[in-house]
């Protein structure tokens, strides 16, 4: 289409991440004129500094670990294997570049204009964009979708210096491979990067203030994951508090109070602080925010400003890339599809990409207990699954939670090889309101990791075949 002065759009999208670019494309598919404003690279944090580059590094790490540490297990002799760290980082960045370029292509294909710069909402229907040189452009449109995402939360007492105390973005482009690393926070980001650096030989100490690592997961997963990490040589300190960080220029010392009350000092080349994110909110006079600083929206993703909507991490809730995309699609269809009632995400899978992988959807067992829900548990280990044994990937299990009376699937928790792919089956089952009887009626291909799902269904009634 091509932007020109005085042009008015059906939709101005602020932010080109998983919410912004998906919302822009959906609006274009509906025949609307769209412009997307992005101050950095299209694709957002996920594609450029999160989901995608971490998965690239993870694959690099797994390849190295399998060759250097497990080759003999498969009858292969490998000697003199080493890491070319600059090449590792370069591959990760090249993948992000490729996919960001793919989104730029999709913008052209769908006739979406792209304006680079920082956006400021002057009034409903008016957005001012300031580019890197300070020049301003005025955009006008009938609707505005704010999809500005979130950024790494920086703890005031642990200020980033870009060298020894860093956030996740810096962890993806470290110039040299550190020999040791302290990671504060064991959510998905902290856990994944702990595993990645461990693969390459970095001595990792993972510190979590809550009683378990991966604290948002089911208790069985938390316990098993901590055991798996410790077996690999990753030091896990759950229920611990980092009292202070002392920067030495080329290293950093953390003073940590363990859960037993004892204080110890840990020194490492670098400390990664991964304790969550905070919303990024554009300048907009009168825009209503929540107490935590997120943009306040109603059930239709509308803000308090007329014609201004918001979706994705900037509105809080379940802050995942796939949730953001869903919310943006719902918001856009609510704007332009007559009779459409936008939906809020309710059934959202969560995935952690380390080894073994972790994936979950629905309720955790402790939630059912606290709510007084009558339930039954089906749990089955991968070590009894033929494909897992043949692949040398026997760690982990499938755990399914069913309603005691009707057998409805209430939650699914998978830890093991391919967990992030396997979770789609129970998610679909929950979405379709399938029962344990329905899931048992399916035929599961053999030999596959998915057979553990079938065995877990049977195990809920004490009928597992290979137990």
Predicted regions and their residues:
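Glycine-rich flavin
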Residues: 2-9, 25-32, 37-177, 205, ...
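Short hydrophobic core segments
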Residues: 12-14, 119, 138-149, 183-184, ...
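Flexible, glycine-rich terminal cap/loop adjacent to redox cofactors
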Residues: 14-19, 25-40, 52, 56-63, ...
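Residues forming the Rossmann-fold NAD(P)(H) cofactor-binding site
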Residues: 21, 191
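Gly/Ala-rich phosphate-binding loop of Rossmann-like dinucleotide-binding domains
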Residues: 24, 28, 194, 198-199
């Amino acid at each position: 289409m091509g932007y020109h002065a005085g042009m008015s759009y059906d939709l101005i999208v602020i932010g080109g991440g998983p919410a912004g670019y998906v919302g822009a494309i959906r609006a274009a598919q509906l025949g609307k004129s769209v412009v997307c404003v992005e101050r950095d690279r299209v694709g957002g944090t996920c594609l450029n500094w999160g989901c995608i580059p971490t998965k690239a590094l993870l694959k690099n790490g797994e390849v190295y670990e399998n060759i250097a540490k497990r080759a003999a297990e498969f009858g292969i002799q490998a000697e003199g294997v080493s890491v070319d760290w600059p090449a590792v980082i370069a591959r990760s960045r090249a993948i992000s570049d490729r996919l960001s370029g793919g989104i730029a292509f999709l913008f052209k294909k769908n006739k979406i204009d792209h304006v680079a710069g920082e956006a400021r909402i002057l009034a409903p229907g008016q957005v001012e964009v300031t580019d890197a040189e300070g020049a301003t452009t005025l955009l006008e449109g009938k609707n505005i979708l704010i999809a500005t995402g979130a950024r790494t939360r920086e703890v005031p007492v642990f200020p980033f210096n870009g060298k020894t105390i860093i956030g996740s973005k810096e962890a993806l482009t470290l110039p040299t491979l550190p020999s040791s690393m302290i990671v504060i926070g064991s959510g998905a980001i902290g856990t994944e990067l702990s595993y990645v650096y461990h693969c390459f030989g970095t001595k990792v100490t993972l510190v979590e203030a809550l009683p378990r690592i991966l604290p948002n997961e089911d208790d069985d997963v938390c316990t098993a994951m901590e055991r798996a990490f410790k077996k690999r040589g990753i030091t896990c300190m759950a229920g611990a508090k980092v009292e202070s960080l002392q920067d030495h220029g080329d290293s950093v010392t953390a003073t940590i109070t363990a859960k037993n009350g004892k204080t110890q000092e840990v020194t490492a080349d670098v400390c990664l602080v991964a304790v969550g994110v905070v919303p990024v909110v554009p300048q907009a006079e009168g825009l209503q925010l929540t107490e935590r600083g997120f943009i306040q929206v109603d059930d239709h993703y509308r803000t308090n400003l007329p014609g201004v909507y918001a979706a994705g991490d900037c509105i809080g809730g379940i802050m995942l890339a796939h949730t953001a995309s869903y919310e943006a699609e719902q918001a856009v269809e609510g704007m332009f599809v007559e009779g459409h009632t936008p939906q809020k995400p309710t059934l959202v899978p969560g995935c952690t990409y380390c080894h073994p992988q972790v994936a979950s959807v629905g309720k955790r067992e402790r939630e059912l207990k606290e709510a007084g829900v009558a339930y039954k548990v089906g749990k089955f280990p991968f070590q009894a699954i033929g494909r897992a044994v043949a692949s040398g990937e026997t760690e982990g299990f499938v755990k399914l939670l069913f309603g005691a009376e009707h057998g409805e699937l209430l939650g699914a928790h998978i830890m093991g090889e391919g967990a992030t792919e396997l979770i789609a089956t129970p998610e679909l089952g929950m979405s379709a309101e399938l029962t344990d009887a329905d899931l048992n009626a399916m035929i599961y291909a053999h030999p596959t990791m998915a057979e553990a799902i079938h065995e877990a269904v049977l195990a809920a009634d004490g009928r597992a075949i290979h137990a």
